[in-house]
């Protein structure tokens, strides 16, 4: 039986040569998952806010709660990822003041 030795390219050289190390591949896959998850949360917010805009009268409290939960989850997820610019998101998604008030944001 012959023993195999493992040979690893130094990280400094790997970066300059553009060689993907296991760590780089893992980071890339994690970023892909984060982006996909954030996109899904954003679509959930869009859907919940559309339902809120269309819903008046009886049952609005439940729709408002669903929209608030979706927005809160989305904002928390963004903050965990280091994306802290709430004002741009509020403007982009057209998040109503009543939703932000329920979250407790100023």
Task: Label every model-predicted segment.
Residues 2-14:
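Conserved ATP-utilizing enzyme core subdomain
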Residues 11-26:
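Short, charge-rich amphipathic alpha-helices with coiled-coil/heptad character
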Residues 22-55:
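N-terminal acidic leader/helix
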Residues 28, 105-106:
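Peripheral, non-catalytic segments of secretory and membrane proteins
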Residues 60-104:
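Amphipathic alpha-helical packing elements
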